[in-house]
Amino acid sequence: MLCTRCHHFEAAPDGVLCTQCTAPAGFQSPPVGAPKLWLRSPVGLGRATAVLLAVAAAVDVFALGADFLMYDVTGDVVGGDLGDDVLDRADLADTLTAVAASAQAAVLLACAVVYVIWFWRVRVNAEVFAPDGHRKARGWVIAGWVVPFVGFWYPRRIMLDVWDASSPEGRPRGHALVNAWWTLWLLTTGAGRFVSSMAGEADTSQEIHDSMPQMMFADGVDLVAALFAAAVVLRLTRMQDEKAHQGPAVPVAV
């Protein structure tokens, strides 16, 4: 007869449960040929994602230092100080600003790739926990970040569904951390685009000097957003790990 718990596999000859359901709780590997969704540990991916987000925050700190130096030295130039020391600092500020911009772009790309892989993993796990608890198709885990307009709310909606499905106690936890992360993400995205446009139009020392406070604001918001994103990743990863070890992983048909 079929297992009385999962209703997918034959029960063991001497019981009413299959070998999968009688296995120790936690993340299990599917039997060969089983076309099912199975829990897979998000711990390694979660830690890697959090580390990259921490690196992004560190790069933002470096960028803030470069911004302040640029603001300071352009203020001297605007004030008429063109001594050798000021010119040397101006060259250093140019170099540090360029390095910071390149580092931010590289880390952003790395974070995006690893984050989406982690997001896909926790979404699949959440479907195992709660097959009917998701309002958006799984493909939106990726498409939601790149399709115009829907990117303003789809990733948050998916995250909330995953968050609720992953609550170890079986009751949805509060969404304050997710909402704070998403607000900061929208803010840093908008500020980044505005500041990039503004910086691209700044040609004179006065214009560069005037753009630096906005640049520092954008880098500061990005720093906080990265830290909140890491907090969400670590919290959700821990929630899924705890939930997986509360009971056996039950397979669900695709």
Positions of the model-derived regions?
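Individual transmembrane alpha-helices with interfacial aromatic-anchor signatures
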Residues: G174-H175, H209-D222
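Interfacial helix-start motif at the membrane-water boundary
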Residues: D88-L108
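Membrane-interface extramembranous regions at the lipid-water interface
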Residues: L2-D94, V114-I142, F152-A191, V195-I208, ...
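All-alpha RGS (Regulator of G-protein Signaling) helical domain and cognate RGS-like helical scaffolds
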Residues: V146-F149
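N-terminal hydrophobic alpha-helix used for membrane targeting or insertion
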Residues: T49, V107-A110, S211
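Alpha-helical transmembrane segments of integral membrane proteins
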Residues: A101-V107, C111, G144, A218-V221, ...
